[in-house]
């Protein structure tokens, strides 16, 4: 069992565990939702992204279902939502968050990190986390690549407000 993480504050009923401004944009660029013991990983991801100049907000929703309206509101202020769970990702919490955002017309990409639906060889928790690429550095690398790709996409395809 992981050590409890103190919240910096509670916002909309959601525990905020880490907050990094990144490049000074308004609102978090990446919302990182860490569930249960993966809340520690979410903080590690936020710290690693901050070292790369990427703003983030790492949160623990305190409960997962139903998806809290406050989590949907926080997601609406992000460019990317990342969920991290140590359960099966298919049909897991990340999927529930994605569905809740879609129902609320919040158009933000969601990346789900969790275990694949497969038989796991007998191993320690650490070995499983490592083989599933659920360590903070693995997820941070994936998120940084996604953020970079989103930035290139905006440059290649500006939105109407960017056309000047």
Regions found by a protein language model. Name each.
Residues 1-164:
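Thiamine diphosphate
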């Amino acid at each position: 069992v992981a050590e409890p993480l103190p919240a910096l504050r509670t916002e909309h009923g959601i525990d905020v565990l880490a907050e990094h401004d990144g490049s000074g944009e308004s609102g978090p660029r990446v919302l990182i939702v860490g569930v249960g013991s993966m809340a520690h990983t979410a903080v590690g991801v936020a710290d690693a992204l901050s070292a790369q100049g990427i703003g983030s907000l790492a949160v623990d929703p305190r409960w997962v279902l139903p998806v809290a309206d406050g989590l949907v509101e926080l997601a609406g202020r992000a460019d990317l939502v990342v969920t991290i769970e140590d359960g099966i990702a298919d049909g897991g919490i990340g999927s529930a968050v994605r569905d809740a955002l879609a129902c609320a017309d919040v158009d933000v990409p969601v990346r789900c990190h969790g275990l694949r639906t497969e038989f796991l060889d007998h191993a320690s928790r650490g070995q499983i986390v490592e083989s599933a690429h659920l360590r903070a550095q693995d997820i941070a690398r994936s998120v940084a690549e996604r953020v970079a790709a989103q930035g290139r996409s905006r440059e290649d395809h500006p939105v109407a407000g960017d056309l000047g």
